[in-house]
């Protein structure tokens, strides 16, 4: 899988060099939207701390999300289910969301697919094009690493 994601990225390295601020900014915005959304909804629905930290890794790839959930004291099986549901929703809704918001730039499409819907989003990004696929693959890795740090900080929030 890593090689399959790395080859398109290497071939489209020019886009990474051309749009580094947009790519990192998009990944950070997506990560904070996910973590902030989980925080707000957890407070609104009265979830306890265990349920809250269980949902924090919902927008990263399963391999990273399982370890993060366990480290934060979450319920790993529920985390896996939330990751799958998030990925499925992102995969199914991606085209409609891009059309609704008139998002046409291949880098923006790729970053949002990888950041918001991880591997399932990347499979959808591949249907849009090679640039989208490469940016989505990059976003999976970077978002996963940043979310480990971000979720650890968000997990300290008590409500």
Language model features by range: what are they?
Residues 51-78, 84-86, 104-142:
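Alpha-helical membrane segments and immediately flanking helix-loop junctions
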Residues 43, 149-159:
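Juxtamembrane boundary at the C-terminal end of a transmembrane helix
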Residues 88-93, 144-149, 153:
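Hydrophobic transmembrane alpha-helical segments of multi-pass transport and channel proteins
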Residues 3-10, 34, 38, 94, ...:
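Alpha-helical transmembrane segments of polytopic integral membrane proteins
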Residues 25-65, 86-103:
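Transmembrane alpha-helices that form the ion-translocation and gating core
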Residues 13-38, 80-89, 139-144:
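Entry/N-cap segments of selected transmembrane alpha helices
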Residues 10-21, 42-48, 68-75, 99-103, ...:
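Short juxtamembrane and helix-loop transition motifs at transmembrane-helix boundaries
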């Amino acid at each position: 899988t890593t090689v399959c994601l790395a080859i398109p990225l290497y071939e489209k390295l020019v886009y990474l060099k051309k749009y580094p601020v947009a790519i990192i900014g998009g990944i950070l915005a997506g990560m904070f939207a996910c973590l902030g959304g989980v925080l707000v909804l957890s407070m609104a629905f009265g979830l306890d701390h265990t349920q809250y930290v269980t949902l924090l890794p919902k927008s990263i790839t399963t391999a990273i999300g399982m370890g993060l959930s366990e480290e934060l004291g979450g319920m790993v099986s529920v985390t896996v289910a939330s990751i799958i549901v998030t990925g499925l929703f992102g995969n199914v809704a991606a085209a409609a969301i891009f059309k609704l918001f008139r998002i046409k730039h291949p880098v923006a499409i790729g970053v949002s697919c990888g950041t918001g819907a991880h591997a399932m989003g990347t499979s959808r990004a591949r249907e849009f094009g090679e640039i989208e696929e490469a940016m989505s693959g990059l976003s999976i890795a970077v978002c996963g690493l940043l979310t480990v740090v971000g979720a650890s900080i968000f997990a300290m929030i008590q409500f």
